[in-house]
């Protein structure tokens, strides 16, 4: 809806599957498109799955055929199949990677020829602190979301000469998907209660900004939105180094390097709640 209020025509893609990718329902996409049209905007509902390259391409083709061009792609399709690592099935791994990472690739790839031809465009990919920091029971989701960061960085570098930008957002929000996250421990239940206070409409202003010409100088960045707080993440950078002229041995690493590095080592059990321990603002 915020895109509409800023003059953008919108292709609403949502096959209407459940939180784990099951089923399908035209209702969510069509309802959103109808709401945009009722408010005086232009919109069209596309029900294709981003996991299918042809379906992903149809999202872009619908935009070009109905509205004449495409200026921004928001890759936010997602499902969850959370389970502890030793119980995760190959199917649960593939399904989550396919929607998040492959879906991001498929839609972005389909838009790229148009962006190159017009020498402009903006990719906005949804990542997660589950990938940036880590989370229990989400090996598939974490891998996909960190993979999206790598994809975005490469797109930003490869497409800069064509005037195309690529950025990531890690959203904190209660949604149809996050509602399916198991909450069995006190810590998980506390996280869910925090998420319930954060709505998706708080993410929209940054998405619209990054899609706009006002953000022409912004690319290859990782942001997060947590209610009224916008966060800029650093990329991994060296924080300590140690040189030994004669080279290292396993014994000297244990005796010298690890004690020197220990104050700066990340905690082994670190999750998002350790980095964001405070209530959303």
Per-region residue spans from a language model:
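Short, small-residue-biased leader/transition segments that mark boundaries at the very start
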Residues: 1-2
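The beta1-alpha1 cofactor-binding region of Rossmann-like NAD(H)/NADP(H)-dependent oxidoreductases
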Residues: 26, 30, 47-61, 90
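Substrate-binding pocket helix/loop in short-chain dehydrogenase/reductase
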Residues: 84-85, 92-97
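Active-site helix of classical SDR
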Residues: 108, 144, 152
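C-terminal helical subdomain
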Residues: 189-281
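Active-site-adjacent segment of SDR/Rossmann-fold oxidoreductases
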Residues: 5-6, 113, 117, 133, ...
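Residue(s) in the substrate-gating loop at a strand-loop-helix junction
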Residues: 128
């Amino acid at each position: 809806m915020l895109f509409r209020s800023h003059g953008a025509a919108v292709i609403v893609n949502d096959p209407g599957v459940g939180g784990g990718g099951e089923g399908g329902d035209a209702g969510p996409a069509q309802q959103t498109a109808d709401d945009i049209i009722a408010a005086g905007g232009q919109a069209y509902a596309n029900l294709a799955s981003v996991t299918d390259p042809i379906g992903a391409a149809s999202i872009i083709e619908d935009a070009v055929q109905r509205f004449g061009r495409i200026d921004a792609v928001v890759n936010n399709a997602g499902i969850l199949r959370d389970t502890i690592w030793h119980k995760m099935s190959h199917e649960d791994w593939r399904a989550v990677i396919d929607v998040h990472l492959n879906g991001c690739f498929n839609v972005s790839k389909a838009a790229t020829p148009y962006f190159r031809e017009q020498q402009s465009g903006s990719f906005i990919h949804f990542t997660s602190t589950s990938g940036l920091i880590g989370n229990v029971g989400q090996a598939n989701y974490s891998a996909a979301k960190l993979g999206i960061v790598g994809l975005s960085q490469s797109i930003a570098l490869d497409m800069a000469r064509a005037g195309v930008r690529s950025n990531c957002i890690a959203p904190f929000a209660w949604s149809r998907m996050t509602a399916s996250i198991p909450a069995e421990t006190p810590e998980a239940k506390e996280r869910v209660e925090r998420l319930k206070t954060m709505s998706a409409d708080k993410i929209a202003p940054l998405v619209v900004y990054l899609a706009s010409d006002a953000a022409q100088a912004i690319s290859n960045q990782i942001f997060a939105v947590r209610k009224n707080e916008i966060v800029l993440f650093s990329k991994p950078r060296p924080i300590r180094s140690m040189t030994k002229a004669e080279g290292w041995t396993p014994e000297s690493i244990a005796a010298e390097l690890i004690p020197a590095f220990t104050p700066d080592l990340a905690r082994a059990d670190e999750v998002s709640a350790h980095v964001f321990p405070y209530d959303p603002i």
